[in-house]
Amino acid sequence: MEYPTFTDARRALDAGETSCEALVSSFLERIDARDNEINAFTSVDQDGALNHARYLDSQRERGNPRPLAGLVLAVKDNICIRGYPVSCGSKMLADFSSLYDATVIDRLRDAGAIFIGKTNCDEFAMGSSNETSHFGPVRNPHAPEYVPGGSSGGSAAAVAAGLCHAALGSDTGGSVRQPAAFCGTVGLKPTYGRVSRSGLVAFASSLDVIGPLTRSAEDAATILNVIAGEDERDSTSAPVDVPDYTEGLGDGVEGLRLGLPEEYFAEGLDDDIRRMVTEQVDRLDDAGATVEEVSLPHTEYGVATYYLVATAEASSNLARYDGIRYGHRADLQETKQALQERREELKEELASARAQGDEARADTLEAQLDDEQSTLDALYTRSRTEGFGDEVKRRIMLGTYALSAGYYDKYYEKAQRVRTLIRHDFERAFEDVDALITPTTPTPPFRLGEKTDDPLEMYLNDIYTVTANLAGLPGLTVPIGEHPDTPGLPVGLQVLGPHFDEALLLRIGAAIME
């Protein structure tokens, strides 16, 4: 690629070596050449991107350049852009188009970003491999038989394959950082509340965060400068001043205190990833940082806590998709016919039970007939059964169970208490160190289909990322090389920091990538 990062493209634009239209055309050619194999995009807005690029070029000629003019950006398909599809990778919303722009889209468009298309993702952002999408799996651009990670796998794959300068993703339990690590890009999860969630289709509202995936720390900082800040449309956005994240990127790590959480380097971590992360830590030590071990004792409960909190919130958020107000609607006549057939079956079984003198079974069948669904309830059930995939159904059922009478205190309330303990672990650690260095994932990318039959093993892939979401902390992953046992497939290193200190993470990330 001639201009792989936006920083490169901006220099070329300023020097008159290229134009916004030429940049968009170059990426469209690459999408046409590569995306049939990768499946990173669910839709591409060729005409819209080219028209906007021409407009930005005309503005530059008039002496009115925008700060992000020339940034060709892909957007995860759970973030709303007015008039664009917003499917969330689900049959439930396969034909739905957004009626408004997310706040991040408003801010990026005003700054001159060019939206080239929507990227594929795990259904409703629920997954760690991008295999649950209604539009088919995304493939890792470095090795198509491997997963790109999830749920923002399409965004990570698009950036890694050079199909755009950068992409937006959402991170609920690692969904920006894990695919960024698997695809070899930078992935930033800002502090909860740093970036508005308005226009992000909700998965778990207390965990969801929008963040950029890029090819450099500088590009991530440039995008965060625009999308960060309080928003009156999102009551959870924080009234905290936004610094210039590009300042200090080259300051290095001298004098910083970096912590290595012992729980993140324990059993279960791939040996080569351990070695590669340790080598980077040694480099940081040589560059003037002070490195020490720290403990986050409640880390072992992170995955269980996350999957209770996230699924409980998901079961509530996804209740809105009923096929009536919006979402996939089952065929009404087929629903009525199926309902009538079921009633006839129950009547036949009831008659048989009475004929055999089985009063207990007859009473049960009679109660079922009395409680049989109305046509409207049956339509809800059929629409949701057809519209949601298996993983989404699994999480809705788990969340509904955790919130049900008799189990709320036992599971959900206890998970919230453990969540508080996890946050306190980080607060104590940051009294002694400035930032934490960890692996992003316990393993390198795995093959497509390798873990689809074992949800627990898939969930455990999030073990190093979910705690940052539970605590609301910022997290950054940067690529640190290729895994020796899976040649060509990247490994990521994660940096975690105190609330609202994204600038520190980007500074450390830039030092690692030098």
Swiss-Prot record:
It catalyses: L-glutamyl-tRNA(Gln) + L-glutamine + ATP + H2O = L-glutaminyl-tRNA(Gln) + L-glutamate + ADP + phosphate + H(+). GO terms for biological process: translation. SUPFAM superfamilies: Amidase signature (AS) enzymes. InterPro entries: Amidase, Amidase_CS, Amidase_dom, AS_sf, GatA. Pfam families: Amidase. Keywords: ATP-binding, Ligase, Nucleotide-binding, Protein biosynthesis. Its EC number is 6.3.5.7. The keyword Flavoprotein does not apply. It is an enzyme of class 6 (ligase). One of its GO terms (cellular component) is glutamyl-tRNA(Gln) amidotransferase complex. Coiled coil: none annotated. One of its GO terms (molecular function) is ATP binding. The active site is at K76 (charge relay system), S151 (charge relay system), S175 (acyl-ester intermediate). Belongs to the amidase family. GatA subfamily. PANTHER family: GLUTAMYL-TRNA(GLN) AMIDOTRANSFERASE SUBUNIT A, MITOCHONDRIAL (PTHR11895:SF7), TRANSAMIDASE (PTHR11895). Heterotrimer of A, B and C subunits. Allows the formation of correctly charged Gln-tRNA(Gln) through the transamidation of misacylated Glu-tRNA(Gln) in organisms which lack glutaminyl-tRNA synthetase. The reaction takes place in the presence of glutamine and ATP through an activated gamma-phospho-Glu-tRNA(Gln). This is Glutamyl-tRNA(Gln) amidotransferase subunit A.
